[in-house]
Amino acid sequence: MSGTVAAPEGITDPPIDELLTAADSKYALVIYAAKRARQINAYYAQLNEGLLEYVGPLVETRNQEKPLSIAMREINKGLLTVEATESTED
């Protein structure tokens, strides 16, 4: 039955090793992707209201693809940049 199982998607596509080139660590990558996934989710939520406050997906999306998978593909293609913020010490 070769060819009947769809190729795995999600964290295996794109590979984690490729994604780690865009961030300093696995933890930074998780935060980076989660923030972008929240923006994509908010974009879809506001479409019904006619507001366009957030930027939608920057890559072609598949049917019922999760925002986190979309965010990871955007990161892998180099469509997003990370800017370090300075932490303020009290």
UniProtKB/Swiss-Prot annotation:
Coiled coil: none
Listed EC numbers: 2.7.7.6
InterPro entries with a match to the protein in the record: DNA-dir_RNA_pol_omega, Pol_omega/Rpo6/RPB6, RPB6/omega-like_sf
Membrane-spanning ranges: none
Keyword flag Transcription: yes
Keyword Transit peptide: no
One GO cellular component term noted in the UniProt record for this chain: DNA-directed RNA polymerase complex
A GO biological process held by the record: DNA-templated transcription
GO molecular function, one term: DNA binding
UniProt keywords, alphabetically: DNA-directed RNA polymerase, Nucleotidyltransferase, Transcription, Transferase
Reaction it catalyzes: RNA(n) + a ribonucleoside 5'-triphosphate = RNA(n+1) + diphosphate
Matching NCBIfam families: rpoZ
Description of how the protein assembles with itself and partners: The RNAP catalytic core consists of 2 alpha, 1 beta, 1 beta' and 1 omega subunit. When a sigma factor is associated with the core the holoenzyme is formed, which can initiate transcription.
This protein's name: DNA-directed RNA polymerase subunit omega
Protein's gene: rpoZ
